[in-house]
Amino acid sequence: MPISAAALPVAVIGVGFLGRPLACALPAPVLALSRSGTWPEGPVPEAIQLHALDLVHADRGALTRVLAPARSLVICVAAGRTQDRRAVYIDGLTRLLDACADLPLTRVVYTSSTSALPDHNGWLDDDCPDPPDGERGQIQHEAENLLRTTCEARGTPWVILRLAGLYGPGRELFRLYRADPDAIQP
């Protein structure tokens, strides 16, 4: 059942660990894209229209058709344990942004990670000229720059959220620290 553009303002790209709770919290209806097209917790909620689209392999036309009703994007993609990070975060984001080139988007929100910042013992802000230390951070930083420059060139408002402590299902931070009780300081 198609949903009109007026009734579907937000598309959540990536409805896994972060995107799924967000999609459920947004006012109905919500357009949701996932690599698998499945909803792990039983049936897809009635307010959510779920589409299976893998950003790494989807063609521009398919992405544009699915996203055409959206007026805002929230990008919550994550590389799986066996996926190539560059393919997901750079190639997939490029494909997504290309597909949205002619859409009248009012805002793009990108969920990133604090790994996009360098490892410093001190205060950091967005003006820090130093690159991130590891490959993961460098790819995240590159993806942020891609989003920023593309949105600015199109005049689309954008927000990058750098989240910390993202470990995904079954890898909660507490469980990681449990092995070393001294790692958690009051």
Feature map (PLM): residue ranges:
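Conserved Rossmann-fold cofactor-binding substructure of NAD(P)-dependent oxidoreductases
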Residues: 45-71
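Conserved N-terminal Rossmann-fold NAD(P)-binding element of oxidoreductases
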Residues: 10-14
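N-terminal Rossmann-fold NAD(P) dinucleotide-binding loop
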Residues: 19-20
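A conserved pocket-lining segment of Rossmann-fold NAD(P)-dependent short-chain dehydrogenase/reductase
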Residues: 173-186
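Short-chain dehydrogenase/reductase
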Residues: 86-90, 125-145
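NAD(P)-cofactor binding segment of oxidoreductase domains
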Residues: 70-109, 145-146
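Conserved beta-loop-beta element that borders a ligand/cofactor-binding pocket
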Residues: 145-169
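Conserved Rossmann-fold NAD(P)-dependent oxidoreductase catalytic core, especially the SDR/UDP-sugar
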Residues: 95-134
